[in-house]
Amino acid sequence: MKTLLIVLIKGYRNFISPLFPPSCRFQPTCSKYALEAVERFGVLHGGSLAIKRILRCHPFHPGGYDPVPLVDSSSKRSQ
């Protein structure tokens, strides 16, 4: 499943994205973020991070630098 999602994201980046002018408000782009998130955290958590990021990518959000987290913050216990 992870491989399929990665292939779909790469397909979007290579074939669909070039047809439109750049419009992502973030660095790295949302598709690059999604690819890194799925590679690092897998389909469920990485996909969830990607969806949340895509939902923030709109004209009313300032955007900016927003990298994929280095560690899975959902697994940290509050002390």
Curated annotation (Swiss-Prot):
For this UniProt record, the keywords arranged alphabetically read as follows: Cell inner membrane, Cell membrane, Membrane
Subcellular localization: Cell inner membrane
One Pfam family from the record: YidD
Claim: Plastid is one of the keywords in the record: no
Q: Per the record, GO CC terms?
A: plasma membrane
Report the InterPro entries cross-referenced here.
Answer: Membr_insert_effic_factor_YidD
Q: How does it sit in the membrane?
A: Peripheral membrane protein
Q: Which HAMAP family match?
A: UPF0161_YidD (MF_00386)
Instruction: Give the function comment from the record.
Output: Could be involved in insertion of integral membrane proteins into the membrane.
Q: Please report which protein family the annotation says this sequence is part of.
A: Belongs to the UPF0161 family.
How is this protein named in the record? Answer: Putative membrane protein insertion efficiency factor
> Which species is this UniProt entry from?
Rippkaea orientalis (strain PCC 8801 / RF-1)
